[in-house]
């Protein structure tokens, strides 16, 4: 492992546990740091804190006492979900303490190069595609970050011959100092997490941090169809590699005459790809670009794209019941994701299940995508806002329910054979559910109860 000596005897404050904070605390302990862990959840209910205390780590739970920062810490590692406006984090920064996230630790200790994937939508699908292509091409990839295992846990085991394929959120990227991926991917930028970042500009800048430390020895895979992405990449040092679902580029990954091309070579016919949804073509193009940069052969890419059907909770087919098809798109935590989901069913009659956490967004951008939606079933804090837009779109059937579980039988009663019943909330889940996965699993369970 690189840079392990740096942490020996360093006094480190870890703020916030959950998966990434817990992994960071364990790693720092192994590296010989003197750690204090601080978490909001009371100790009696906090399994992670209890486990860390058993390792001999100092644990302070039940709040974030500002006086803790009067102690002489060298570094603060914060859980990515804790915003920079948090009083504890603000005080640490005012004191001039470095404040980083667990991904930074992973970079410091990893022998393997990173492939970092970010964007408002499509991160998980693209990350999974890249991992599968590199695995098929025998490039020894390891999957890390927002998918599955915390990055620093994976980085501990990584060797120089591996690739660390890492999904990165704006929360993680906002706090990087040294992190430098060999290949970065910026898929798209859309208004998201404004409650965390404050403005779209701050959110976009956090995403653009993925390029911050790259040099001309590295690659940046960027979406030529997204104007803001291209602006953010204008002055970067990495070699730019574009992908486009709408333009014939000549270089990079693009579509021409029904084929996906890499530079001037046809890789696969679009008709042979089994992953549904036009929006997934962008994810596929980005993945093809990364795979080719990592040295994967066309045969391996073809094998993945003719067998990969998607990721759970992302436009996931659930069941057909009495001629109605049910799709779980619980990962649609913003408006753009729901636009793309509705575009995938533009020739179908759709009953849309939507709503969730109110982050201050309006939903007028959904209007052009509602022409084939015959009814909406709404839940959560944003239900009235989405209902207003549905009325503008001329949708007469608008139902309010308490939650996703109750939405499913209501949607079924409103439907006819041949209809698509689509959960695509356009909102985060946190007003009612811990995660979008929990929301999606409840939807799946409710669908199966109809059988």
From Swiss-Prot:
Catalytic activity: UDP-N-acetyl-alpha-D-muramoyl-L-alanine + D-glutamate + ATP = UDP-N-acetyl-alpha-D-muramoyl-L-alanyl-D-glutamate + ADP + phosphate + H(+)
GO molecular function, a single term: ATP binding
Binding site for ATP: 119-125
EC number, UniProt record: 6.3.2.9
Record keywords: ATP-binding, Cell cycle, Cell division, Cell shape, Cell wall biogenesis/degradation, Cytoplasm, Ligase, Nucleotide-binding, Peptidoglycan synthesis
Top-level enzyme category: ligase
GO cellular component: a single term: cytoplasm
Keyword check for Cell wall biogenesis/degradation: yes
Major localisation: cytoplasm
Subcellular location: Cytoplasm
Domain of life (superkingdom): Bacteria
Pfam families (alphabetical): Mur_ligase_C, Mur_ligase_M, MurD-like_N
GO biological process: cell division; cell wall organization; peptidoglycan biosynthetic process; regulation of cell shape
Pathway: Cell wall biogenesis; peptidoglycan biosynthesis
Function: Cell wall formation. Catalyzes the addition of glutamate to the nucleotide precursor UDP-N-acetylmuramoyl-L-alanine (UMA).
Alphabetical list of HAMAP family matching this protein: MurD
Family statement: Belongs to the MurCDEF family.
Name of the protein: UDP-N-acetylmuramoylalanine--D-glutamate ligase
């Amino acid at each position: 492992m690189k840079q392990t000596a740096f942490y020996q005897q360093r006094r480190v404050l870890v703020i916030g546990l959950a998966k990434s904070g817990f992994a960071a605390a364990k790693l720092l302990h192994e590296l010989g740091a003197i750690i204090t862990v601080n978490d909001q959840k009371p100790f009696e209910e906090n399994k992670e804190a209890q486990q860390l205390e058993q390792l001999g780590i100092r644990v302070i739970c039940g709040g974030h006492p500002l006086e803790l920062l009067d102690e002489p810490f060298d570094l603060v590692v914060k859980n990515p979900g804790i915003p920079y406006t948090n009083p504890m984090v603000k005080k640490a920064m005012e004191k001039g303490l470095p404040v980083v996230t667990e991904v930074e630790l992973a970079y410091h200790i990893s022998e393997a190069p990173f492939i970092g994937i970010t964007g408002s939508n499509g991160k998980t699908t693209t990350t999974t595609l890249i991992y599968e292509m590199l695995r098929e091409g025998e490039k020894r990839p390891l999957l890390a970050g927002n998918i599955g295992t915390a990055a620093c846990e994976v980085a501990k085991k990584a060797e120089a011959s591996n690739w660390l394929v890492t999904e990165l959120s704006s929360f993680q990227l906002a706090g990087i100092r040294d992190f430098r991926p060999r290949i970065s991917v910026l898929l798209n930028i859309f208004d998201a997490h404004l409650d965390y970042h404050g403005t779209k500009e701050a959110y976009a800048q956090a995403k653009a941090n993925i390029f911050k430390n790259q040099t001309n020895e590295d690659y940046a895979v960027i979406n030529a169809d997204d104007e803001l992405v291209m602006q953010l990449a204008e002055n970067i040092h990495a070699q730019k590699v574009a992908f486009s679902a709408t333009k014939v580029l000549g270089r990079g990954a693009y579509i021409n005459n029904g084929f996906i091309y890499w530079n001037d070579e046809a890789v696969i016919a679009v008709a042979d790809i089994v992953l549904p949804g036009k929006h997934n073509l962008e994810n596929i193009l980005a993945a093809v670009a990364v795979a080719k940069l990592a040295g994967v052969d066309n045969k391996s890419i073809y094998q993945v794209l003719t067998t990969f059907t998607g990721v759970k909770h992302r436009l996931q087919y659930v069941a057909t019941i009495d001629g109605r098809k049910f799709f779980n798109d619980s990962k649609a935590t913003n408006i753009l994701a729901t636009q793309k989901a509705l575009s995938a069913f533009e020739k179908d009659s759709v009953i849309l299940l939507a709503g969730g956490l109110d982050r201050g967004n309006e939903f007028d951008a959904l209007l052009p995508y509602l022409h084939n939606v015959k009814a909406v079933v709404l839940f959560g804090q944003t239900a009235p806002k989405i209902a207003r837009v549905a009325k503008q779109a001329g949708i007469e059937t608008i139902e309010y329910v308490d939650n996703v579980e109750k939405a499913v039988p209501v949607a079924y009663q409103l439907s006819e054979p041949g209809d698509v019943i689509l959960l695509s909330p356009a909102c985060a889940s946190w007003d009612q559910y811990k995660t979008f996965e929990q929301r999606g699993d409840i939807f799946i369970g409710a669908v199966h109860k109809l059988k």
